[in-house]
Every structure is written in C-alpha cells, then in structure tokens.
A protein has these predicted regions:
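N-terminal helix-turn-helix DNA-binding core of bacterial DNA-binding proteins
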Residues: 1-39
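Basic amphipathic alpha-helical segments that dock to polyanions
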Residues: 40-42, 46-47
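Glycine-centered, phosphate/nucleic-acid-interacting loop/turn motifs that mediate DNA/RNA or nucleotide
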Residues: 51
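A cross-family signal for key residues in well-ordered alpha-helices
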Residues: 12, 45, 54, 80
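Amphipathic alpha-helical dimerization/coiled-coil segments
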Residues: 77-106
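Basic, amphipathic "hinge/linker" alpha-helix immediately C-terminal to the N-terminal HTH DNA-binding motif
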Residues: 61, 65-83
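Conserved catalytic-core motifs of GNAT/GCN5-like acyltransferases
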Residues: 56-60
C-alpha cells in the first residue's frame, strides 16, 4: 500500500510544476514520508517508461545540469484516476468510521 501512496504523492508533487529529484524528496520529507534516492529513482524511471512522466535537462548554477520531471497528458489522466480512487477510499473509511469508537477493555 505504501508504494501506491508514494506513487500518488510523487505525481501530486510533480503535477504542481516541473521538479528536480531533491525537491521531490524535500516535499515528501515535509509530509513525513521519508524516501531515499535509491527508492525514488527506480520509481521515477518506471513512471517515465510507462509514459506518465517526461523530463528536461536544465542548466544549474550550482553544478551539472539537472533533470526536471513533469507529467505527460497520460500522467495527468492517471493522476485523476488515482485521485478518484483515493476519494472513494476516503469516503468508504469515513462511512465505516462514523460514530465508531474503539472500546477499551478493562
């Protein structure tokens, strides 16, 4: 499940604007999702190979050129599907949890 959530969060971040890997890691860290580059790069590669992401090289003032990722049209469509699925899951959980309290056994 974490993989699906991580993928969803990454696509949400990239949907805002083209981003560099360290920007993705920083945003995930702020959201308390700790991810290392060794996890992120294969996932980005899989999303790119699946036609959901593209990238462009941009010059950097602080070193070598950087690869900035952005969503393709297919990526935006897939993100919308994930958004719909997430909303369905959230709605289901809310329905199940209404007036549900956890009993404490004494």
């Amino acid at each position: 499940m974490r993989k699906g959530i991580l993928e969803y969060c990454i696509l949400l971040i990239i949907n805002k604007k083209p981003v560099y890997v360290s920007d993705i890691i920083s945003e995930l860290k702020e959201a308390h999702l700790i991810v290392v580059e060794g996890t992120l790069y294969p996932l980005l590669s899989r999303l790119k190979n699946g036609g959901l992401l593209s990238y462009q090289w941009q010059e950097s003032m602080q070193g070598p050129p950087r690869k900035y990722y952005e969503l393709t049209d297919a990526g935006r469509s897939f993100l919308q599907e994930l958004e719909n699925a997430w909303n369905d899951i959230r709605h289901t959980i809310e329905k199940v949890s209404v007036d549900n309290t956890i009993a404490v056994v004494q």
